[in-house]
Every structure is written in structure tokens, then in C-alpha cells.
């Protein structure tokens, strides 16, 4: 019976199409001059001159007018012919201008009446949403929002409510191009997948978004710990942003927002399209993941306004850049044109989100001074991800990490550091860490979160190309260990000896891999003393000192 129901659901999903407006929408969806250059222009401000804000996806869903326009414009965008340079297929989901244009077109198609004006008003300040994958979901809701889960949805539009293909569930290739997509079996699938479940349908497996939800939720504690460390101790833009910079400069602090971002690619895809670098942008999740990453970068910039991009050599060839060529803030960001005369955007010209006509609620300067915003964000960072988590764990475990008579609190942050060649294996892989012996079933490691007395304590995900670019770039990532030590009741003076005895790691690609086969792999454990003043929201970090080498 369950199998029959599954097949019926698949049949309904296959039959569902885009929204039917009752008119030919090809001319509306296409740009007026398909032969002209695609120029990335700033989106317009509101009538009162303010910069519209990008909302979190659950916040947008609460506004039915904006939500309808978002789903309808996503659906229309995905429906554009793959031959069009402005189609989802060719742009692969990173061009917000098209969504804004389509939202305004669709708003104008609603029949006259109160709702039509509400849709037109919503379209004026329409901006892409983000999904906040660093915050726990509201009570009673799934961590991975349920708007991604269902293949079909009932959607209101200018012609009333219709059952359509959910544009957040997948992108359907039209036509499927097996030659371009290269990887087997992904090349044979007609739509993007997440955690493809071949037990239901082998030729065209369904996406298992329940598995994606469980695995991503298991990674939330380490994501929040890593973000707290990044936002409280990384003051250099290159170090914060780039997973190749620290190794190239022989730095001791080896994390980056790029490395944290890799977690959502690997575990949001789980062997589906998000897991593969060249295919990831086809998945609708890519768009919301990268707007969230953009938000985090914007928040860090507001906290560190004087730090900016330093010159760095390109790690591999691209269509316009040779390996080893120095890239700096004035280097053209091809293929993104800023004007019809052939001028490209640069890091300098795109430094602020306002240059593109949007901001975030957390970075909006309306009615604020920059220093006031910086202080506000310092408090928010601690509230979102921060040090109170350590202090709470410490109190609950009965471990005092500082003198009670002191106004300051101290603890030692232990961190596992990974250095590895970006093309060490043929594509993505992960390094799993354990306190004690790992489970013999490596298929369980991705979902393990250290609860229920299992030994798994975290993962460093490596989102990488297969071995075809000739890159010899070394990259890095980290895993904070302190929370796992506190949860196990390890006294501060015993931490180092405990880690020497118990800390283990395993490498997992498509299956378990011998570490000796992983090019450039180096793992050590370092620690830093952290001070938290009683009246401060900002931890002060001591020098990071290497204590042991796990693999070299």
C-alpha cells in the first residue's frame, strides 16, 4: 500500500505544471531584447527613498501577497526556455533582477480590486528571501522549512488557485541535457534532487527532504559554534571569507564563512545536486542558501567596516582568469556586467548590498549611526550563537572555568583544525570526528549529533570539484570541541589528555576512505583562552596554540 501511494504521489508530481495564466507568458517572461547583454543593475528604492530589505523565508511566507509573488515568479523564472541567457538554466538561480521583474509583471496580471493593488504594492519592494540555517526553527516547525518539502502545492494567482509544481522543491530540466550534467546517475534525472531516495523509484528517485531536515538539524550546534568564533575573533576579511587564505598565509586560525557554507551544500544535497559544485545552483535551495551567506557577510562587514579584500592569487583557471593571476578589489567580477558599455562589477563596487538595491533587517542603517549598528550587532551575535551557550553548559555540568570572585569568566576553546588539498578526492567529502570509537556503520555518521551517548561530535565538510581543474590549492576548516568536552564532564585540566586518548577521525566520501589516500591532509588540535567580561557581549581571544597533531 505504501509503495502504491508513493507511486501515485510521483504521478501527481510529474503531471503538475507551472501556473496557467490563461495567456501566453513566454513573451512576458523573456527579456525584450534577448540578444542584448545582461547587465546587473541596482533594484529600485521604495517611493520614500528607503532600501527594501530581504526577509527570512518564514517572514516572507507570513505576507501572503509577497509570498504569492515569490512562488509565482520562481515558477515563471524556472519555466523560461533553457536557450534564453536569462533563464534559470543559464543563470542557475543567482540573478535576483529576474525575480523582481517577473514579480512586477505578475502583480499587474491580477484582476482589478483590492488584492490587485496589494500585489502591486508588494511587488514594489519585493526582494529575494533567505533561509536562516543558523537559527533553530519556531516551535512545531521543521528546521528545514516545509515550503521545500512537497512536489506540488496549491497556489493562488491571477486565475485563482491552481495545483502547480512547487518551484522550491526542484527545478525541472526542459530538456534534460545528459551531456552537460556528466555525473551518473544525476545526468539521467529530469529534475534536481535532495537526498535522492532510490528505494521508491530507481530511474527517477524522489527527494527525501525529511532526511535533509534531520541531517542539517544535527549540524546546527557546530554551525552556531563556528559562527560565534568567526564573528568574535576573525577581524581580517580574507581570513573570514576564504577557505584557502589561511593556509596560503600559514595562519593558525583556519576557519572561514566559506567553509561553514559548505555544510549546507553537502548536507542540503546529500548526494543530490546541491552536493556537486557545477550542479548545485540548479537546486532552488541554492538561492536561499546564498542569500543567507550574503547576509552573514554583510553582518560581518558592519562589525568590521575597515577590513577589506587583500590581493590573492587565483587557485585555478577560469574562463577569464589564469591560475596564479593576482586578484584584487579592482579585478573584474566576470561575467557580471555593471553597465552596457562592458564595465564589470568589482569587489570594490559591490562591497555594500545597497549597491544592488537591498539590505537586511540586521544591517539596515535607516535611523541609525554606523557605530550604534555595530554595537547592536555585537549583542545580537552573542544572543544568536554565542558564549552564553558555553557558560550554560558549564553551569549545568558543574564545571567552573574561572574564579567565582572574578568579574570576568574564562574558558579554554579547543579546536580541531583541518588542512587538505581541495581536489584531494574526486569531489566532495567530509571529515568526521569522534570522542571514542566510531560506529562501524559509516552511513550513520552524517546524522549523528553527539546525543544519545554516541561518540560522533561533528564534521568538517569539504565542498570540492572533482579532479579536473588541476588545482593544487590547500583549503582549511575547523571543528570546535569544547562543548563536547563539557557535555562529557571533562575537567579543564584533563581536556588535553582526554583528547589525546579519545579523539579520532574518519574520512567519508561516497564511502569510507583511508586517510593516507587524502592528498595534503593535516589535522591538529589547538586551544585558546577566552575571556568574557561580566558587562561585555564580546569575548576576548588569546593566542591560538597547537597542542597535538592528529594526522600529518
Identify what each model region corresponds to.
Residues 1-17:
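Cleavable N-terminal signal peptides of Sec/SRP-targeted secreted and luminal proteins
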Residues 17-552:
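C-terminal accessory segments of proteins
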Amino acid at each position: 500500500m505504501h509503495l502504491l501511494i508513493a507511486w501515485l504521489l510521483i504521478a501527481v508530481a510529474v503531471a503538475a505544471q507551472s501556473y496557467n495564466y490563461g495567456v501566453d507568458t513566454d513573451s512576458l517572461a523573456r527579456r525584450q531584447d534577448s540578444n542584448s547583454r545582461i547587465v546587473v543593475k541596482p533594484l529600485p528604492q521604495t517611493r520614500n527613498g528607503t532600501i527594501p530589505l530581504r526577509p527570512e523565508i518564514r517572514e516572507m511566507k507570513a505576507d501572503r501577497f509577497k509570498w504569492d509573488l515569490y512562488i509565482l515568479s520562481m515558477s515563471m523564472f524556472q519555466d523560461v526556455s533553457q536557450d534564453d541567457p536569462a533563464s534559470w538554466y543559464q543563470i542557475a538561480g543567482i540573478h535576483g533582477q529576474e525575480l523582481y521583474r517577473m514579480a512586477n509583471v505578475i502583480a499587474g496580471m491580477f484582476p482589478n480590486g483590492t488584492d490587485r493593488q496589494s500585489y502591486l504594492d508588494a511587488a514594489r519592494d519585493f526582494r529575494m528571501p533567505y533561509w536562516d540555517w543558523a537559527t533553530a526553527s519556531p516551535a512545531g516547525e521543521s528546521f528545514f522549512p516545509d515550503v521545500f518539502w512537497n512536489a506540488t502545492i496549491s497556489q493562488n494567482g491571477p486565475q485563482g488557485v491552481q495545483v502547480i509544481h512547487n518551484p522550491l522543491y526542484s527545478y525541472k530540466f526542459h530538456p534534460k541535457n545528459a551531456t552537460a550534467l556528466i555525473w551518473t546517475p544525476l545526468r539521467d534525472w529530469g529534475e534536481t534532487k535532495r537526498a535522492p531516495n532510490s528505494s521508491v523509484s530507481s530511474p527517477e528517485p524522489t527527494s527525501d527532504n525529511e532526511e535533509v531536515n534531520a541531517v542539517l538539524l544535527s549540524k546546527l550546534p557546530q554551525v552556531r559554534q563556528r559562527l560565534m568564533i568567526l564573528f568574535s575573533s576573525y577581524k581580517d576579511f580574507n581570513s573570514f571569507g576564504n577557505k584557502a587564505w589561511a593556509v596560503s598565509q600559514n595562519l593558525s586560525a583556519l576557519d572561514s564563512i566559506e567553509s561553514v557554507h559548505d555544510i549546507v551544500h553537502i548536507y542540503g544535497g546529500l548526494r543530490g545536486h546541491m552536493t556537486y559544485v557545477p550542479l548545485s545552483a540548479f537546486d532552488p535551495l541554492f538561492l536561499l542558501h546564498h542569500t543567507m551567506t550574503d547576509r552573514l557577510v554583510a553582518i560581518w562587514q558592519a562589525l568590521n567596516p575597515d577590513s577589506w579584500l587583500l590581493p590573492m592569487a587565483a587557485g585555478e583557471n577560469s574562463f577569464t582568469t589564469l591560475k596564479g593571476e593576482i586578484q584584487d578589489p579592482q579585478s573584474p567580477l566576470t561575467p557580471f556586467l555593471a553597465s552596457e558599455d562592458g564595465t564589470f562589477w568589482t569587489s570594490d563596487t559591490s562591497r555594500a548590498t545597497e549597491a544592488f538595491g537591498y539590505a537586511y533587517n540586521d544591517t539596515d542603517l535607516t535611523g541609525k549611526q554606523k557605530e550604534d549598528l555595530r554595537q547592536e550587532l555585537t549583542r545580537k551575535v552573542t544572543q544568536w550563537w554565542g558564549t552564553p551557550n558555553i557558560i550554560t553548559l558549564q553551569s549545568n555540568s558543574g564545571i567552573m572555568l574561572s574564579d567565582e570572585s572574578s568579574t570576568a569568566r574564562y574558558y579554554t576553546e579547543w579546536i580541531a583544525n583541518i588542512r587538505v588539498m581541495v581536489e584531494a578526492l574526486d569531489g566532495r567529502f567530509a571529515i568526521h570526528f569522534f570522542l571514542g570509537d566510531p560506529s562501524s556503520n559509516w552511513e550513520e555518521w552524517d546524522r549523528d549529533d553527539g546525543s544519545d551517548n554516541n561518540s560522533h561530535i561533528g564534521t568538517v565538510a569539504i565542498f570540492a570539484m572533482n579532479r579536473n581543474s588541476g588545482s593544487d590549492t590547500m583549503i582549511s576548516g575547523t571543528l570546535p570541541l569544547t562543548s563536547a568536552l563539557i557535555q562529557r564532564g571533562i575537567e579543564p585540566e584533563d581536556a588535553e589528555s582526554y583528547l589525546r586518548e579519545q579523539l579520532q577521525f574518519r574520512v567519508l566520501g561516497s564511502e569510507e576512505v583511508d586517510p593516507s589516500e587524502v592528498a595534503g591532509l593535516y589535522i591538529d588540535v589547538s586551544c585558546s583562552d577566552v575571556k568574557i567580561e561580566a558587562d561585555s557581549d564580546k569575548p576576548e581571544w588569546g593566542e591560538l596554540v597547537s597542542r597535538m597533531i592528529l594526522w600529518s
